[in-house]
Structures are given as structure tokens and as C-alpha cells.
């Protein structure tokens, strides 16, 4: 079984989403023997944004990296993403990664009856952090976008582990992290994924 772990925060060791994504991964690695984890830090090792040269495949190194990104995603049974909310949405580095895996003919296809996802059978867990509180707010373009893009690729099991209001005060931050850690996938859920 393979797990793909991505982090998109620019805050390094001060990142709440990184702390939460690491806890999610630890929950899975602690319970699934032989779990192979592939990790990519999208801040330290970003996926290039799509450009005309990307489509023309004139940059061999970029084309090779794009194929590796795609293959890691296709091979993963579980995808864990540390995704902070930036300006009501996601970091551009995460969007660049999504642009490399949401590819017609690879992870979805168009039909006369509408798009069909080709990447089903995966479980996605998003470790989300937000300075304010945006759940059920019209300003939340992060979670709806991530749910939609993964559903478009055929992945309907998308779970969020969320810490909100972390910029309000140190106590809010601590409480939000504790609440998010308490909401990690249960041992039963992990066992069901491993089965």
C-alpha cells in the first residue's frame, strides 16, 4: 500500500497544516505494516506552474518531473495533503500540483454524458489550517474546490482535518490544533483503509 504525503505551507516548522499532515501520516504508518510513504514538500520542491512550454513538452526536466508527479499520484492508495488556506483558497504551489494530476485521459475523461473520473479507489485526507474561521462561510473557496477537483477525478472519499482560528490568539491556536488532532482518522478507519 502506498501513501503520498504533500505539504504546501510556506511556514516550515511553524506550520499548523504541516503538523496536522504529519500526524495523519503517523496514524497510518503506525497501523499499516509495510506502508510506503512518498513525500513532497511543495514549498521546497515546487511543481512548475503550467506554461505553454509545459504543453509543448520542450523542457525535458519539467516533463520528467510532471510524469513522476502523475505516477506518484496514480500509484497512491492514500493521499495526505497539508493545505493551509491562503487568501480564501489554496497555495499556488498546491494548485500547480493539481494542474499536473488533473489531466484529461489520465485522471478524468470527457464523455457525451459529462466528465468521468479515472482515479477512483483512493482516499484523500486534507490537513487544513486557517487563520480565521471559515467553515460554512461563502469565503471558503478552499474546501469546496478541493472536494470538487478530487471528485472530478473520481475520488469521493475526501476527508478534512481542520484547525481554524489559529491567528486569533495562542490559546485559540492551541485549542484548534488539539481539536484537529482529536479528529484524526480513527484506528477503525485506518484499519478499514488497510483491508
UniProtKB/Swiss-Prot annotation:
Homodimer. Binds 1 FMN per subunit. FMN binds at residues 9, 15-17, 85-88, 129-132. Belongs to the azoreductase type 1 family. It comes from Stenotrophomonas maltophilia (strain K279a). It holds the Pfam family Flavodoxin_2. HAMAP family: Azoreductase_type1 (MF_01216). GO terms for molecular function: electron transfer activity; FMN binding; oxidoreductase activity, acting on NAD(P)H as acceptor; oxidoreductase activity, acting on NAD(P)H, quinone or similar compound as acceptor. It catalyses: 2 a quinone + NADH + H(+) = 2 a 1,4-benzosemiquinone + NAD(+); N,N-dimethyl-1,4-phenylenediamine + anthranilate + 2 NAD(+) = 2-(4-dimethylaminophenyl)diazenylbenzoate + 2 NADH + 2 H(+). InterPro entries: Flavodoxin_fold, Flavoprotein-like_sf, FMN-dep_NADH:Q_OxRdtase_AzoR1, NADH:quinone_OxRdtase_FMN_depd. This is FMN-dependent NADH:quinone oxidoreductase. Its cofactor is FMN. Keywords: Flavoprotein, FMN, NAD, Oxidoreductase. Its EC number is 1.6.5.-, 1.7.1.17. PANTHER family: FMN-DEPENDENT NADH-AZOREDUCTASE 1, FMN-DEPENDENT NADH:QUINONE OXIDOREDUCTASE. Quinone reductase that provides resistance to thiol-specific stress caused by electrophilic quinones. Also exhibits azoreductase activity. Catalyzes the reductive cleavage of the azo bond in aromatic azo compounds to the corresponding amines. The keyword Kinase does not apply. Gene3D superfamilies: 3.40.50.360. It comes from the Bacteria.
